A protein has these predicted regions:
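Acidic/glycine-enriched connector segments
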Residues: 2-165
Length: 165
């Protein structure tokens, strides 16, 4: 993977998101409330750029929240860290529409690879953690999958984690 070292944002002012693709739909409003609170708290403490991997589930939800706070959080930006071109090709019609609207309104879109490869999601997660000073997570404690990997990587690098699970 070709690493992108030059970005428009500063690591010290950036937070990344990680979370499960699937969650209990009956808890959607509670999850949104917790994510919103974590985003506002981060913003209050100097985080102005939010990096999302734009996967189905928590990533898209968090990106939507960041965009909804545009008027109440001056200077906040949304960065899309896309693991490979065509990420949304297999999304449902609704998720694809949400994805495309968010991509169109994102402040920066980084396509990390032109095509899918086995580690592309993990490499995207590493990119986000390595370019953030805070990780906002929706992590249930299971020791498998991309959310676990990202959570573990942030801890290894000494990056603070706010888990809204």
């Amino acid at each position: 993977m070709k690493r992108m070292n030059k970005t428009k944002f500063a690591k010290a002012a950036s937070a990344a998101f990680t979370g499960h693709r699937f969650y209990n739909f009956s808890q959607k409003e509670l999850i949104k409330e917790r994510l919103t609170k974590a985003i506002l708290e981060a913003y209050k403490h100097g985080i102005s750029n939010f990096i999302s991997g734009f996967a189905i589930g928590i990533d898209l939800m968090a990106a939507q929240i960041v965009q909804s706070l545009k008027s109440s959080c001056p200077g906040r930006t949304l960065t899309a860290a896309i693991p490979f071109r065509g990420q949304a090709d297999r999304f449902s019609a609704n998720d694809k529409m949400v994805y495309e609207n968010l991509i169109a309104s994102a402040d920066e879109v980084l396509i990390l690879s032109e095509r899918y490869y086995t580690r592309c999601f993990l490499d995207r997660d590493e990119f986000m953690v390595e370019n953030a000073s805070l990780l906002i997570a929706f992590y249930d404690g299971r020791e498998k999958g991309g959310t676990y990997y990202t959570f573990k990587k942030a801890n290894y690098l000494g990056i603070p984690v706010v888990n809204v699970y």
